Regions:
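Acidic/aromatic-lined carbohydrate-recognition and catalytic surfaces
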Residues: 1-79, 83, 94-95
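Carbohydrate-binding surfaces of carbohydrate-active enzymes
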Residues: 1-7, 13-14, 92-103, 108-650, ...
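Residue patterns forming the tRNA-binding/recognition surfaces of aminoacyl-tRNA synthetases
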Residues: 78-86, 90, 279, 320
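Short, well-structured beta-strand segments enriched in hydrophobic/aromatic residues
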Residues: 554, 649-651, 688-706, 805, ...
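Glycine/proline-rich low-complexity spacer/linker segments in large multi-domain proteins
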Residues: 563-580, 703-738, 855-924
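Extended, low-complexity, turn-rich repeat/linker tracts enriched in Gly/Pro/Ser/Thr and Asp/Glu
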Residues: 655-662, 811-818
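A beta-strand/beta-hairpin structural motif
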Residues: 830-833
Length: 927
């Protein structure tokens, strides 16, 4: 269950802040003495230059349904949140499911100081609450209010005050929110999961949630968020979470993943992102998101949607089965890391304004360990305080034992941590420093103790470690090869067996490596969850096994009792394939869904049709009318150019019943029945007999009511929704102006396969082509969402019985490719390698090849007008020119600026579409 009306969690759709000011989010603000205290502000203290106020959030946030956020430092507010949300769910459903099968997902709760009066100038906002004052006093025995200035200025014992402040903040948020909800879940055999806001780096963690490790330790199933189509330099978040899960022996770990990757994220890319998670210890995948409906703004709600709307939905089970297999593999046995990296989070607490951040140096260490096949955990100092001990020469945290401890760049260290590290060193443990040693203990100067630490550590530059890692920390398993650092491994501990997870971090290239097995390893077996298949691994004289990993390939190797009785097949040796012939265009194309022309520009009138605007984006018209709070008659006039009238054509649109009149070329039409396109909210009506060659006009009349985004009534929050309309049917969609674009947002990434996008300026309807070169996007189907059967024939000499023949479809762009040779299904390709063995299907003479291709909703739903062309991070504002997350800067009045031909940051009237079909030739290979 999801615990909120929207996000961030905790305000119960507005119910909690509605209980009174004590329940509303608060912050500390520093103002000039002459600045008027805004409504909601309460003076806490003054000094000679500033006044410090506690500000209580006021109603007026659209994200909170016109209300504001809740004070999650307040345990009473959280208790009311539980009573309004968790308790009704659990009382209704807990008896219907088995223990530990009921989950509640919390989404981005936080204590970030971000809700303040926009008109009041300030000198910094910090998290605050009367409950935080009380917690601070309880923990440290002095008043936080007396030291507010030291949260802003570097005077006196400011480092210690800040350390205490952030510790109190982190501990109280865990206690008030996470632990209280987790304890309530325990009563019902339920599990708290989800993720918190700002887990990406240490500064965000400090400011937004205090300490993510504390929430991970309290959740029954800790979780994280992974947004966008990238994995580079993002180790910190999953490793922090899985480290705490390891230490507290929490076997399942969740990630909300694939969010904002866009409708065109394919199975290969999902495999790439998921494999990265699994090799780092995540074993429960929560895809973002499934849309109940695509009505209105839902089409733009941080796509993709994983739902029946997607053309590939029939095949999605293959992806989910694969995810299930690698999730299970990541739970077998126990993680057995050699090294612990102490988290420098608390150095982020105590740093001054001119002192650098601590995330990047730490991440360099994590990447160096991961790339050199050294298993590790992160150690949070609060977790160390609660769970750590020294046993012989091992540093123990809960369920985990480490033989090496690494200190990254640090400014302060706890006395409790230092004492354990010195004992660890005294007992023979190895202690490295790969950055500046701490200058403070518990945020206070203690030169003698720090000198003792200096004597104990082996100082080591990261470059030295990278040059000869085995000299300092022997890897858990040795992997060699030209690109061995791009193959990540995780060793799982099992009695009388070996178990290794392997992952190719490259989404682009296959990689070949040699895995060195321990002496005496018996019966090594390779498990490939993508085929799926199990294969015998030949061992060389040195105990090595050679493995070739497909792009984003995830595998595991077992030996000993884990391989006993497994019906493994001989490992197929990659043949040395050479091109034999190509299958040339033209191809015949047959779609399995209606073709579509998207109409997202219209002329509009607010004077009863006497005058009309020039064509504008429908989403821009909606924005302008709402910004002006226009209420009244609205007329929209869409146009479509037709060069040959199609035999069948339908108008598809949302909420036709809300319109006073709908007309096609001045002929009124009515919608009836339940026929729809893509989603039940998009109704269809046959208009075949109403079209003509040339310009066709579709006119809509509706009583427009501006939305009130601050209204608690959901109807009034949205009111009249203006959306794109569609023509669907049996026709082709063409353009006289098309350009190939290589400089896309996607192609700026070094980690993704490069592919072009196409820029269209306008469209017209004409007869479909009988044959084309194989790229459907450029051949009459730029907006098409569905399946396309490409057919061709080729002559082949008598096949050689001693040879194998393969069809290489690397030049094909589709989410799914089903290969049919001479009316027999050879394979269905969902991910690399896009090569299929067709040996047994070939015959002498004429052979028929059919490629059943399936795409996504990207070309239908967009975003079509973003200058990035093909995006790897997509949000609602990616469909407009307004800017915001994840697009960055834009222009709030973009819809007016575009009329002035202003060069906008994001928006362009050009349509950007992605390829669907063959971008090159299909090639037959032979060994």
């Amino acid at each position: 269950f999801y615990d909120e009306d929207k996000w961030p969690s905790g305000f119960a759709g507005g119910l909690i802040p509605g209980l009174g000011e004590d329940f509303r989010a608060k912050c500390l603000a520093r103002l000039d003495l002459q600045t008027a205290i805004p409504e909601g502000g309460r003076l806490l203290k003054k000094d000679s230059l500033y006044q410090y106020i506690q500000y209580t959030a006021q109603y007026g946030y659209d994200i909170f349904n016109g209300a504001c956020y809740a004070d999650l430092f307040n345990p009473n507010a959280v208790r009311k949140f539980i009573e309004s949300t968790h308790q009704p769910y659990f009382e209704k459903y807990s008896h219907k499911v088995a223990d530990n099968a009921l989950f509640i997902f919390t989404d981005e709760p936080h204590i970030h100081a971000r809700y303040f009066d926009a008109r009041t100038k300030h000198h910094g906002l910090l998290s605050y609450s009367p409950y935080l004052e009380e917690k601070f006093q309880e923990l440290y025995g002095y008043s936080l209010r007396d030291h507010l200035g030291q949260l802003y200025e570097e005077k006196g014992n400011w480092r210690e005050v800040r350390w205490h402040y952030y510790l109190a903040k982190a501990l109280l948020f865990e206690e008030s929110y996470t632990r209280q909800i987790a304890d309530f879940c325990d009563q019902y055999g339920a599990q708290l999961t989800g993720h918190y806001l700002g887990e990406d780096d240490l500064k965000k963690v400090r400011d937004r949630i205090g300490n993510s490790a504390l929430h991970y330790r309290s959740m029954q199933q800790p979780g994280i968020d992974h947004l966008g189509l990238s994995i580079a330099h993002r180790l910190f978040t999953p490793k922090y979470m899985t480290s705490v899960a390891d230490q507290y022996d929490k076997p399942r770990r969740l990630s909300e993943l694939f969010g904002i990757s866009g409708q065109n994220v394919n199975f290969q890319e999902r495999k790439w992102v998921a494999g990265w998670h699994a090799i780092l210890g995540v074993n429960h995948f929560c895809p973002h998101l499934t849309a109940y409906s695509l009505k209105g703004a839902r089409k733009r709600d941080y796509p993709p949607t994983f739902s029946y709307h997607q053309p590939y939905w029939t095949y999605n089970k293959r992806m989910e089965d694969y995810l299930g297999r690698i999730s299970y593999a990541a739970t077998v046995g126990h993680f057995d890391p050699q090294a612990l990296v102490v988290s420098p989070l608390e150095s982020e607490y105590v740093k001054g304004d001119r002192e650098g951040e601590f995330t990047s140096g730490m991440v360099q260490i994590l990447e160096a360990l991961q790339n050199n096949h050294i298993d590790f955990n992160l150690g949070d100092e609060e977790v160390i305080l609660e769970k750590a001990a020294v046993a012989d020469s091992q540093f123990v945290i809960g369920a985990m034992r480490y033989r090496y401890v690494i200190l990254p760049d640090m400014l302060t260290i706890r006395q409790s941590t230092l004492s354990l590290l010195l004992r660890f060193h005294k007992n023979g443990g190895v202690l490295y420093s790969m950055g500046r040693l701490p200058q403070y203990i518990d945020a206070k100067s203690d030169p003698a103790a720090l000198n003792e630490l200096k004597q104990a550590v082996i100082s080591l530059r990261i470059a030295e470690f990278k040059a000869a890692p085995e000299k300092y920390i022997p890897p858990g398993v040795r992997i060699t090869g030209p690109h061995a650092d791009e193959v990540w491994v995780q060793r799982r501990k099992i009695k009388e067996a070996s178990f290794y997870l392997l992952y190719n971090t490259s989404d682009i290239a296959p990689l070949s490596v040699t895995l060195q097995l321990p002496a005496g390893s018996q019966n090594p077996v390779l498990w490939d969850p993508a085929k799926p298949g199990v294969f015998q691994l030949p061992v060389d004289k040195n105990g090595g096994v050679d493995i070739t990993l497909a792009p984003a390939g995830f595998y595991w190797v077992t030996t000993g009792k884990l391989s006993e009785g497994i019906p493994a097949k001989p490992l197929p040796q990659p043949p040395g394939l050479k091109p034999l012939m190509t299958i040339d265009a033209p191809w015949q194309g047959k779609r399995n869904a209606p073709n579509t022309l998207v109409l997202d520009f219209a002329e509009y009138s607010t004077d009863g049709g006497r005058t009309y605007s020039a064509p504008e984006p429908v989403i821009g018209i909606w924005s302008r009318l709402n910004d002006a709070q226009y209420n009244g008659d609205l007329r929209l006039r869409f146009s479509a150019t037709i060069r040959q009238v199609p035999g069948h054509c339908a108008l598809a649109m949302e909420q036709p019943g809300a319109f006073r009149q709908i007309s096609i070329n001045h002929t009124p039409v009515r919608f009836s029945g339940d026929r729809y396109y893509i989603d039940p909210s998009i109704k269809t009506r046959d208009i075949s007999g109403l079209l003509r060659e040339g310009r066709n006009e579709i006119e809509l009349q509706i009583p427009f009511t501006a939305c009130d985004p601050l209204n608690s009534d959901p109807v009034k929050r949205y009111e009249t929704e203006l959306e794109t309309i569609y023509l669907t049917g049996d026709f082709g969609v063409f353009s006289d102006q098309v350009q190939t674009i290589e400089n896309t947002q996607r192609n700026l990434s070094e980690d993704l396969v490069k592919r072009p996008a196409y820029a269209f300026e306008s469209f017209f309807i004409n007869r479909e082509k009988d044959r084309f070169d194989g790229n459907a996007t450029l051949s009459g189907y730029p907006f098409y969402a569905g399946g396309m059967a490409l057919s061709n024939s080729f002559e082949f000499p008598s096949p050689d019985s001693g040879k194998r023949y393969f069809l290489d479809l690397s030049a094909c762009e589709a989410t799914v490719i089903e290969v049919i040779v001479n009316d027999q299904r050879a394979d269905t390709l969902c991910w690399a390698p896009y090569v299929v063995d067709i040996t047994k299907y070939l015959k002498k003479g004429t052979n028929r090849l059919q490629l059943n291709l399936v795409n996504s909703l990207r070309n239908l739903l967009g975003p079509h007008h973003h200058k990035g062309a093909e995006l790897i991070k997509v949000g609602p504002d990616s469909f407009t020119g307004a800017g915001g997350f994840p697009d960055g800067r834009g222009e709030p009045d973009w819809y007016d600026l575009r009329k002035k031909k202003t060069d906008l940051a994001i928006w362009t009237d050009t349509y950007y579409q992605v390829p669907f079909g063959l971008l090159g030739k299909a090639v037959i290979l032979s060994d």
